[in-house]
Amino acid sequence: YEGEEMSPNVFYTGAAPNQQAIPAVEYLLSEDGGAAKRFILLGTDYVYPRTTNKILRAFLHSKGIQDKDIEEVYTPFGYSDYQTIVSNIKKFSADGKTAVISTINGDSNVPFYKELANQGIKATDVPVIAFSVGEEELRGIDTKPLVGNLAAWNYFQSVD
């Protein structure tokens, strides 16, 4: 599971990275998903993002993506100053089709998505796929600039 631990006395529910992250990244690599060649793995600094990104880095290597085309960035819980990180995303994406894989946790998603909009980054240029954003966090922001960005989640309550 996310911490790569096992126990005969523990039963996990929810998607593991091989059920959530790998199919999502396969989509980003496909023509329909934009045929990304470069990836920014952006997450909150704790076990889930670090383990998921370790798995994704190995998966991307298996698809021929080199380390120079993968950047990992971690922020503390509650982080809100995304100006520099988003500016670096713009610079990194100048060298080819880039996607952001977000494992940002909780409320930190709001300032991240707001900063993407502030700097004019659209999903048609640099798509973001999120594994840790909830519907509740997005209710408080203007989602028009987010159209085209993606989320891979087990369940969306607002979807019929």
Put a short name on every predicted segment.
Residues 1, 101-110, 129-138:
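Ligand-binding clamshell of periplasmic/extracellular solute-binding protein-like
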Residues 1, 10, 149:
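Short clusters of hydrophobic/aromatic residues that line enzyme substrate/ligand-binding pockets
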Residues 3-5:
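Gly/Ser-enriched beta-turn/beta-hairpin loop segments
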Residues 7, 116-160:
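Extracellular/periplasmic periplasmic-binding protein-like sensory domains
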Residues 8-119, 159:
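Extracellular/periplasmic Venus flytrap/periplasmic-binding protein
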